[in-house]
Amino acid sequence: MAVALLSIGTELTRGEIINTNEAWLAAELTAAGFTVSESSTVDDDVDRIVAAVRQLASAHRLVIATGGLGPTTDDLTAKAAARAMGTDLVRDESTLLAIRRRVESRGKTMNAGHEKQAEVPAGSEILPNSSGSAPGFGIHLGESTVFFLPGVPREMKSMFAEQVLPRVRPAAPNNTFQVRLRTYGLPESTLGELLKGVEEAHPGITLGYRVHYPEVDLKVHARAATQSMAHDLALKATADVRERLGTAVYGEGGDAFPEMVGRSVRARGWRLAVSESCTGGLISHLLTSYPASDYLVGAAVTYANSAKTRLLGVAEDTLRGHGAVSAEVAAEMAQGVRRLCEVDVAISVTGIAGPTGGTATKPVGLCYWAVSHPGGLVVRDRVFSGDREEVQLGAAYAVLDLLRRIAGNLPER
């Protein structure tokens, strides 16, 4: 079944925020077997919302709209949906009660904005919101079903999974299956070269790539006569892909790179310490963004040379002789924080994140990182391209990947 997506919000049409909802919904629907054939974005204007809803509903059996269900005056989606149906807004008392309980449980007082969120088109199906106050709702326009969800990503995702997907899944084709592989370390062009011939070797397989620096996601999408056959085809093709890409594949589905690194460290029974300079605490943040990160004992952001010397014991002679951005300093940072925290393994990074500070011999983007572990000390370097944030993220991933490979006894690329 072909599906259309409608994103509602002036902040989207003005480019003030990135439309992550559309990308997420498209990926989830594709994985469920649907085909997203059209997507539109419209500002907070009732007439334009009505026109967009009617146009998409006339051409698709299923439409999913996001945004404009909040408490403010520019949240006009419910009003537009009612007009598209040719009906009025009504206050749903059960929804109002749920909103009141949620608001008062947080020690707040109901206001007109909260009450506005309980107004839905007459005859619509209410979709409860377990993550927020604004409910969603579904309507029928001709032969089309249109679901309206809040634009807040966290609320939209939970409502799609809890309310929408169970309702529409029976209409999805049951002859597809998809595997999502997570990769790091190889650019999209290299992945494409390594995977040449996979689709020809496995008829019914389509490969899709999505770059989100510094990772690349690979979708192995299978279509066959039955879902069981598609499942088997996808697994067979995935095995082929994994063999070609080797350790560049770090996980599947919802696996996250920092989390997988942490699992490798925990599997060795190691305790970890981190020392950072140019990344400013980013590595520690990435590692502790996931549960079960108690393998991390401590971290030090030693941005100034004086902090490197005072906290980590980096020798002043090393700093004078080689500079703060050097293999020697990266090594002493890792060894120093390992001693300081009395741990099994320690990592460090130092570099020039830019946009200023580079020289002819040490350009912007140059980073050194080190891992001090029970088997020895390893130091690596690279010049990363991009803006300051990309250099920092690239360096953080590079040292985590080195740690992953050492902990997992994996070869370096």
From Swiss-Prot:
A Pfam family recorded for this sequence: CinA
Protein name from the UniProt record: CinA-like protein
InterPro entries: CinA, CinA-like_C, CinA_C, CinA_KH, Competence-induced_CinA, MoaB/Mog-like_dom_sf, MoaB/Mog_dom
Record-linked SUPFAM superfamilies: CinA-like, Molybdenum cofactor biosynthesis proteins
Family: Belongs to the CinA family.
Protein source organism: Sorangium cellulosum (strain So ce56)
Organism superkingdom: Bacteria
Region (Disordered) location: 107-129
SMART domains: MoCF_biosynth
CDD domains in alphabetical order: cinA
Biased composition (Basic and acidic residues): 107-118
